[in-house]
Amino acid sequence: MNRREFLKCGAACGALASAGCATGDAARSAAAVGKSGDCPFRLGVAGYTLVNFKLDESLKMLKTWDVGEFCAKDFHYPLKASAAELRELVKKTSDFGVHLYGAGPIITKTEDDARRAFDYCATLGVPTLVGVPAEVFDASKGWAGNRSSRKMCEVCARLADEYKINFAIHNHGANPKTGNPNLYPTVETTADLITDLSPRIGFCVDIAYTHADGFDPSAILRKHAARVFDVHLRNVAVADNGSSGAAADKGVIDYVRIFRTLKDIGYSGVCGLELANAYGKPSEANPGADPSWVPRSIGYFRGLMDSI
């Protein structure tokens, strides 16, 4: 499927998402944008979902899908842009009826990196920085050569207090084929590094990786409720290492229970759909990769939000 075909698909499926209709047993009629019924949290889209599209295209798709929450990524809102340039991009985003709820994930390896990231978030006007405070132990390995850093966690916790911006560490999975076992693989390994630090440093809980690593996502959300600042949503076709993408209503993760848990703990942030693998070519890992997964998943999740 080329870009033009995808955009046509997105427009057609957007009507499904906006109406809140979705296939699958758990689908329900949905409310309007973001918050549904008395559900305390909102539905958004993580920037990485639209990594293959320019900002204008992405904003048009979000408008088509009637999604009003978006997480900024560097390829849409460049980290190296001037403050004036970033403010122009924020205005453009707002003109499409879209609100930036956070930024990241952003890897920070030095205090200068971290301060630059916080300055970026302050200019964007977002309350949450999704980050990966890291140190390099083997530069030849690229991403795999980074590992968790207590020192950088301390730096980011201090800056979170200074800027009054929450810092949410993203778990990237313990399986070396799909994640990095040395770099905040799970929420629990991250918790060991931060629970004595500022309450402004916490978690961006990736539900699929949490499930793939053998944890009960609902139990993790309850245990760490006070430090959950962001949640990434995607589903997997089978109970594997977290790589087999699926539309939300076709996977194996129990999102009905997870959404009820989020409501029970009073989570009032955004749950961001992160489904970039839907835009890849079908493969053994993604045998049914299909761009319609995104609007279809939006409709499904809205239905769940309306039903809980």
What residue ranges belong to the model's regions?
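Histidine-acidic metal/acid-base catalytic patches
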Residues: R4-L16, G20-R42, V51-K63, Y184-V205, ...
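Glycine/Thr-rich phosphate-binding loops of Rossmann-like dinucleotide-binding domains
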Residues: K80, A139, K281
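Extracytoplasmic "Venus flytrap"
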Residues: G47-F53, D74-L79
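Hydrophobic faces of well-ordered beta-strands that scaffold small-molecule active sites
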Residues: F41-A46, F70-A72, L100-P105, L129-G131, ...
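Active-site acidic/histidine proton-transfer and metal-coordination neighborhood
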Residues: G10-L16, K35-G37, D56-E57, K63, ...
